[in-house]
From Swiss-Prot:
Its EC number is 1.5.1.2. It comes from the Eukaryota. It catalyses: L-proline + NADP(+) = (S)-1-pyrroline-5-carboxylate + NADPH + 2 H(+); L-proline + NAD(+) = (S)-1-pyrroline-5-carboxylate + NADH + 2 H(+). This is Pyrroline-5-carboxylate reductase. One of its GO terms (cellular component) is cytoplasm. It is found in: Cytoplasm. GO terms for molecular function: pyrroline-5-carboxylate reductase activity. It comes from Pisum sativum (Garden pea).
């Protein structure tokens, strides 16, 4: 069967699963103008989840079958342990004229393609900062997904942050870094704030300063064009306060601990997939 292109100015996007990630993507797409809410559909039995989508102008249908029938692009955003059963149940409706997308962590592209019965599938790994339009997402293309399909999904996920393309074999490592990474940073923010309190700052000021410092440093690393090591060197004067703090971090194994966290999370992702 010929792979028909999906027209970016007229396609309908359907979500199978109406959780927080689906909501973040839907809001990002509609707010950015990538896709009007009138061309987004989903289904959910929970009144609060229905209301969350209806409040931004999204049509909530009565069943997942109806969502697939109404959609040109179908995004599976259910819990990983449910993906296989959901895809298999919908398989008769998952024709090649529809582009299929999964955002479920740990579910390999080869399995998604096998369950769907065709390879017009794209796997995407976003992360939770999608909720504020700052996701780090990575996609991998199935065997029948076209460059036009990739461009469409890049545009969609670009509305909630940044997206890169990588081979599916890297997704466990991606999970360990950007998938789990926000939790490492939240822990670092909390620790910085606690350090500020220990040094005499009020709690609210310490937390605000810690959060903004991480945000600013991340922006510098992204926008300056400099290696993070160079940025670190730029702020560490000889015999100054910053190098004293960096020395303590090095003595405590700060780098190695972060590296080990990524490796451990990637290993766990492989075990679960």
């Amino acid at each position: 069967m010929e792979i028909l292109p999906i027209l970016s100015d007229s396609y309908t996007l359907g979500f199978i699963g109406a959780g927080k990630m689906a909501e973040s993507i839907a809001k990002g797409a509609s707010r950015s103008g990538v896709l009007p809410s009138s061309r987004i559909v989903t289904a959910h039995s929970n009144p609060s989840r229905r209301a969350a989508f209806e409040s931004i102008g999204i049509t909530v249908l009565s069943s997942n079958d109806d969502v697939v029938r109404a959609s040109n692009v179908v995004v599976f955003s259910v819990k990983p342990q449910l993906v296989k059963d959901v895809v298999l149940k919908l398989k008769p409706l998952l024709t090649k004229d529809k582009l299929l997308v999964s955002v479920a962590a740990g579910i390999k592209l080869k399995d998604l393609q096998e369950w769907a019965g065709h390879e017009r599938f794209i796997r995407v790994m976003p992360n939770t900062p999608a909720a504020v339009g700052q996701a780090a997402s990575v996609m991998s293309l199935g065997g029948a997904a076209t460059e036009e399909d990739a461009n469409l999904i890049s545009q969609l996920f670009g509305s909630i942050g940044k997206i890169w393309k990588a081979d599916d074999k890297f997704f466990d490592a991606i999970t360990g870094l950007s998938g789990s990474g926000p939790a490492y940073i939240y822990l670092a923010i909390e620790a910085l704030a606690d350090g500020g309190v220990a040094a005499g700052l009020p709690r609210d000021l310490a937390l605000s300063l810690a959060s903004q410092t991480v945000l600013g440093a991340a922006s510098m690393a992204t926008l300056s064009g400099k290696h993070p090591g160079q940025l670190k060197d730029d702020v560490t004067s000889p015999g100054g306060t910053t190098i004293a703090g960096v020395h303590e971090l090095e003595k405590g194994g700060f780098r190695g601990t972060l590296m080990n966290a990524v490796v451990a999370a990637a290993k766990r992702s492989r075990e679960l997939s």
